[in-house]
Amino acid sequence: MAVKISTIEVLILSLALLSFGHGCYGQLRLGFYSQNCQNVENIVSKVVGEAFIKDSSIAPAMIRLYFHDCFSNGCDASLLLDGSNSEKKASPNLSVRGYEVIDDIKSAVEKECDRVVSCADIIALATRDLVTLASGGKTRYEIPTGRLDGKISSALLVDLPSPKMTVAETAAKFDQRKLSLNDMVLLLGGHTIGVTHCSFIMDRLYNFQNTQKPDPSMDPKLVEELSAKCPKSSSTDGIISLDQNATSSNTMDVSFYKEIKVSRGVLHIDQKLAIDDLTSKMVTDIANGNDFLVRFGQAMVNLGSVRVISKPKDGEIRRSCRSTCNNPLCV
């Protein structure tokens, strides 16, 4: 007896097989694009490598972009969207950079795999490769993919921890994203290649908590060094390395933790990590250990899982990372 299969049943079966073969967007896994865009990671690595050769500071810039995107509304590339009131326009994001590198990667990927790879995954892969390059090739963590791009980007929704917060306040924000205290301490280790502007530390140098004096938790010698770089009367907002070990401030390593342990943290939150009861032992363990890079990689993977869009109706695969698919560019 012949079995009749309806058109709808065939369609459902086809979709099920497609999902089995390629994975379902929103369900992160390693090798998500292994069948429908096999060369994507090589393409990303090539473009990122060229960008790093031109300007190695793209590494900390991309780590920051990744963090700012994931932490506010989840890893959905909403930070990349242009608009008069998009996330880019929020005060903490005005100095974020790296967008052009993402554009270059997306353009190269689209030539090989049209509307397959999300911008959110491109950010995650590019950041991973730049961490590898900044470490001198000493680490390379595997990052699951399968993210969808978000459709909403609003400056009003940006919610990032301030460098002036206490450890407890910062930890609470991480906890809201299901990121642990351990994740927080490790992710702040990205500051080992980071920089900040003088404006963020002027209070620590000249008027800590309205005392008209420097922050007593900062090494006096460092106060002197930074005051010379960030004078009160300056008309420019200078740039300061967050890792004050001059020999390794451009290298992903454990030096940042060693510096904050001897009161040479630049940002308020960085220094507090080393002296707060919640985190001081973690800082000591990392500073004295040899597995920071491995642990940092795992924390970056955990960050990359924050509020990933799991329903296709809520996300999309953009053709341009700067605009949603409501835009003609997506046609």
From Swiss-Prot:
Cofactor(s) required for function per UniProt: heme b; Ca(2+)
GO molecular-function terms, A-Z: heme binding; lactoperoxidase activity; metal ion binding
Signal peptide: 1-26
Biological process per Gene Ontology, one example term: hydrogen peroxide catabolic process
Residues that, per the record, bind substrate: P161
Subcellular localization: Secreted
Top EC class for this record: oxidoreductase
The organism's place on the tree of life at top rank: Eukaryota
Site annotation Transition state stabilizer: residues: R64
Tissue note: Expressed in roots, slightly in leaves.
Family note: Belongs to the peroxidase family. Classical plant (class III) peroxidase subfamily.
Function of the molecule: Removal of H(2)O(2), oxidation of toxic reductants, biosynthesis and degradation of lignin, suberization, auxin catabolism, response to environmental stresses such as wounding, pathogen attack and oxidative stress. These functions might be dependent on each isozyme/isoform in each plant tissue.
Name the record gives this protein: Peroxidase 60
Organism: Arabidopsis thaliana (Mouse-ear cress)
